[in-house]
Amino acid sequence: MATGDVKGCIRKLEQRLRTLNYPRDVDYSGLIKGDPSAFLPIISYTFTCYSTSIAEILISLGIELATKSDLRFIEAVYKVLRDVFNYKPILTKQQFLQCAFSERKIQIICDIVDCVVKKHKEITGQNKIKNQPVKKIVSAKDQCEVFYPEDMFVQLSVKTEMSTQKKPLVERHTGSEFQLQTKCYKSALLEEAEEEEPTSDCEEDSHLQREMGSPFETAEETPNSEQVELLRKQLAECQEKLQRLDCVEERLQSLETSVKGKIIIDETDWNNLLGRVLLLETERLLQSKKSDLPEFARISEHRTSSRMANEICSNLKTKADIPESHHQSSGYSSVLSADTSPIAIDINYSSLTEESKETTKQRMERITKMMEETSELLKFSNNTS
């Protein structure tokens, strides 16, 4: 190819694109400039969309040409050309991605198209040889029809009725003419039978092909049906998940509306808080009782002393009021043990003080018990926290 013949290269490329049935628009200005964005769509179409067999080969090799950057796409294409087609391009990957070398790029694309078309024809030819249906050999026994006397009788009766309807016509034939007619009739029957035999064979072959179906159709239908079933299952699962999501969203909205303006606390935390509040209240009560104890003792002592003083005064008054003559007239000098003697006064005072001390002791014991219980509760709460 002469250098500078860009138009000739574009004509060759157009011929290759016609063989591929390329449906997209071609950027001729980009081809002339050597812009890689004009060449890459043609390469991707030839490898992915033109032939399903070549696309299957690429998938089996684990090569993906879709959803890639230009550099990775060119790297994958060069790998396919090297491993599958044994073709080494003139330009390097970096040169192909530059805006130059338009003629050589067009030549590379033409070579790629030729390699792909050739490989496609080889694969389809092999598949046709493998999948040719075996012709059924029709024997003479199969072609023979079964004779039923009832059908013959019906046909004869129909012919007799038709002959009765027609007018009788009698002709006289000589022996030689009759023999010639019979020979012509036999030869015509043989020719018709010979013509019907190949047509019947063709009809049987076509019927077998229809019944058996082409292997390509069956091979294509089975994966397609499996894919459709998988897609249906996935759609059903997606619909179920969407319904669950809708239910969850509705429940969340109802919870948000019901819990709006409220504070949610765990049950254990709430119980701990209640226990601590009770402990604090008991501590305050105990402290207040401790502060009130000396005042209470002082008041109780003051009351008891005032009572004793009042009793002593009342006893003295009663003693002064009793006349001495009354004591002398009785004939004995009796001493009022309970009222007049100082020993009795001391006994009464001691009994009163003992009773008040007992009451205060009981109260103090109760308070100490409460203090011990609260201290144990505080220790337990500290250990648990």
UniProtKB/Swiss-Prot annotation:
Map out region (Disordered) in residue numbers: 194-224
Question: In the record, what terms sit under GO molecular function?
Answer: microtubule binding
Acidic residues bias locations: 194-204
One GO term (biological process): centrosome cycle
Tell me which UniProt keywords the record has, alphabetically: Coiled coil, Cytoplasm, Cytoskeleton
An annotated GO cellular component of this protein is:
midbody
Cellular location(s)? Cytoplasm, Cytoskeleton, Microtubule organizing center, Centrosome; Cytoplasm, Cytoskeleton, Microtubule organizing center, Centrosome, Centriole; Cytoplasm, Cytoskeleton, Spindle pole; Midbody
Q: Where is this region: Binds with microtubules and centrioles?
A: 11-191
Q: Which residues form a coiled coil?
A: 224-263, 353-379
General function of this protein: Centriole-enriched microtubule-binding protein involved in centriole biogenesis. In collaboration with CEP295 and POC1B, is required for the centriole-to-centrosome conversion by ensuring the formation of bona fide centriole wall. Functions as a linker component that maintains centrosome cohesion. Associates with CROCC and regulates its stability and localization to the centrosome.
Tell me which PANTHER family the record gives.
Answer: CENTROSOMAL PROTEIN OF 44 KDA
Quaternary structure note: Binds to centriolar microtubules.
Stated name of the protein: Centrosomal protein of 44 kDa
Report the gene name.
Answer: cep44
